[in-house]
């Protein structure tokens, strides 16, 4: 009932937009994007759609290996992103998960501008910690909330806790740490996730807990957005539909 009222105030069904961004390459954005989208779908937050803004197309390659149709995949461009999100909202999608390229580019700025929440995966290393500043600056300038996720951490290593403390000086740190295990990469080979390969694994438990935390933050942010700006602009008639719809495609 409460969510129905909020959606009515916002002009229709809500589409939450979650973006993963990091200046540092190799932070685990693509792996985490796929895992969060799948877990969100499994947890009932769907239908979920994945959007790959990274020109490397790694997320598209992974999705094309999947047997499950959901989460869906939408092909778009930075220039079309805002309008396509409006179309996806009209088509009934509830969550969009966006993967972005490394380095600070116009693409990342555009994604942050339309995202409701930005997740910044960060490995617990000095070089990775130093690289978060540019992403933080972009989020602050856009007035968008961010969450750091300590990723690929060594279990019980001192540097893991030190990284969380250092990141907390710049923003909120998720209370769930993702640890380095081979099952994350192994599960991605054939288009799956650790939750689908071994639901009882520690890695699956971490992703499940992380999504639950992020979902709670998305809900709170959505409520604030509705009360701050109750009348959002609807999609324009005849808006562009992403090329190829939401079926499979061969990534170039």
Indicate residue ranges for each PLM-predicted region.
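Walker A/P-loop phosphate-binding motif and the immediately C-terminal alpha-helix
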Residues: 14-55
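Nucleotide-state-sensitive switch-loop elements of NTP-binding domains
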Residues: 43, 49-94
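Switch II (G3) loop of P-loop NTPases
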Residues: 54, 88-108, 123
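Extreme N-terminal, non-catalytic leader segments
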Residues: 1-19
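Conserved Switch II/interswitch segment of TRAFAC-class P-loop GTPases
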Residues: 112-132, 154-156
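Conserved C-terminal guanine-recognition region of P-loop GTPase G domains, centered on the G4
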Residues: 129-151
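Beta-strand-loop-alpha "switch" segments that mediate conformational coupling across diverse proteins
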Residues: 154, 164-192
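C-terminal boundary of histidine-terminating zinc-finger modules
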Residues: 188-209
């Amino acid at each position: 009932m409460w969510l129905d009222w909020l959606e009515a105030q916002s002009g229709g069904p809500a589409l939450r937009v979650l973006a993963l961004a990091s200046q540092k390459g190799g932070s685990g954005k693509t792996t985490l994007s796929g895992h969060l989208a799948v877990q969100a779908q499994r947890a009932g937050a769907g239908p979920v759609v994945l959007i790959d803004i990274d020109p490397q197309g790694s997320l598209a390659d992974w999705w094309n290996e999947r047997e499950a149709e959901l989460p869906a995949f939408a092909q778009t461009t930075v220039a079309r992103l805002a309008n396509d999100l409006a179309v996806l909202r009209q088509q009934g999608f509830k969550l969009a998960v966006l993967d972005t390229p490394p380095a600070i580019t116009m693409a990342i700025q555009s994604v942050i501008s339309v995202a409701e929440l930005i997740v910044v995966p960060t490995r617990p290393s000095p070089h990775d910690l130093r690289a978060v500043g540019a992403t933080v600056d972009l989020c602050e300038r856009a007035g968008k909330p961010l969450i750091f996720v300590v990723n690929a951490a060594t279990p019980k290593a001192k540097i893991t806790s030190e990284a969380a403390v250092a990141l907390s000086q710049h923003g909120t740190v998720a209370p769930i740490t993702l640890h380095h295990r081979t099952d994350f990469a192994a599960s991605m080979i054939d288009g799956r996730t650790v939750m689908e390969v071994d639901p009882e694994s520690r890695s699956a438990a971490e992703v499940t807990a992380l999504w639950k935390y992020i979902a709670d933050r998305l809900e709170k942010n959505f409520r604030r957005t509705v009360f701050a700006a109750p009348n959002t602009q609807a999609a324009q008639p005849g808006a562009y539909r992403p090329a190829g719809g939401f079926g499979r495609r061969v990534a170039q």
